[in-house]
């Protein structure tokens, strides 16, 4: 397991238990730096791209969000293409249900094949849609984009921000837990997952 982590005091504290774990290699770096991404992709069978700028930061820094999320996607695609076994590497990109807009009737629940319908001023969804198109148009043999819902994380109630009013009154809430999201990513890497 190779982790590309932004070098911050918070991340160093959060991942301190893994620093001496021989099964985990931590690369302190930046998704916007190709060489950092390349270090992580070399020798990989799977690339799970779960990093980037997310809301609510995306609302405050829209230009940085678009730059970060699209540059990260391009760097991952380029790093995979640089590998001698590029056709064997499986890439999982985490998109967002925000790419398909608000959940008003008649589209209350997300489904495979929902059209792209970004809500106005949603720079996060714009960045994720552009990044998804980078993977879709990359020519990589094995890639998937999972348009994930919001993530319930332990400190969510400490995050008092106007983003909590983004859900329209007639909309629905679609959430997944941190644990379920991790379980999904782990299961994708199992050998019995079909090629298609």
Predicted regions: what they are:
Residues 1-10:
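Conserved glycine-rich Rossmann-like NAD(P)H-binding loop of the short-chain dehydrogenase/reductase
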Residues 71-121:
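Conserved Rossmann-fold NAD(P)-dependent oxidoreductase catalytic core, especially the SDR/UDP-sugar
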